[in-house]
Design a protein with these regions (language model features):
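Non-catalytic C-terminal accessory region of glycerolipid acyltransferases
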Residues: 1-172
Length: 172
């Protein structure tokens, strides 16, 4: 009681552009504890570790903390053996982790979004040296989320945006 445990549901450290497939242990642990010892009021707290330069030793890191997840949300009983219950909790965990991390379908798209963020900073006359990692993250997160929504709903518009950013880069 009144303690925390840390679980990294990706199961490994990586430098990929997006979240890896999550392991189900966090859901099974939470549901199992509630089932055997509950009700405990357990919460799963998504935490994002967002590095300034993943490949650089001792680069800056922003630790983003998401909204606590109730593994029993809308359900009276926990069942750690139920695939449906585990998948439901894992869906919430994945959504929570994605809300506090940057996720790009590819490194090319990551570079595009980072370039768009730099153009935004320049247009707003923001000095990247003075911007906090939290400010940089917020801008990139908003751009990445908007990019992914637009890519899904209007791929032609995304193609035009990519061409415009690439055209601007060619002019430089």
């Amino acid at each position: 009681r009144n303690a925390c445990i840390v679980v990294f549901p990706e199961g490994e450290s990586h430098a990929g552009s997006e979240l890896l497939k999550l392991k189900t242990g966090v859901a099974r642990i939470a549901l199992g504890a509630e089932q055997r010892c509950g009700p405990l009021g357990l919460r799963i707290v998504p935490v994002g570790l967002n590095f300034d330069a993943k490949q650089k030793f001792r680069s800056r890191v922003l630790i983003s903390i998401g909204k606590p997840i109730d593994p029993l949300a809308g359900h009276e009983q926990a069942d750690a053996e139920s695939r449906e219950a585990v998948n439901r909790v894992m869906g919430l965990v994945e959504e929570g982790i994605k809300s506090v991390t940057l996720n790009y379908p590819s490194w090319e798209e990551a570079k595009l979004i980072q370039r768009a963020a730099a153009l935004y900073d320049a247009r707003q006359q923001l000095d990247p040296e003075e911007a906090s990692l939290a400010e940089e993250f917020s801008i990139q997160k908003q751009l990445a989320d908007a990019y992914l929504r637009t890519k899904e709903n209007n791929p032609r518009r995304v193609a035009r945006i990519i061409e415009a950013v690439n055209g601007y880069d060619r002019l430089l």
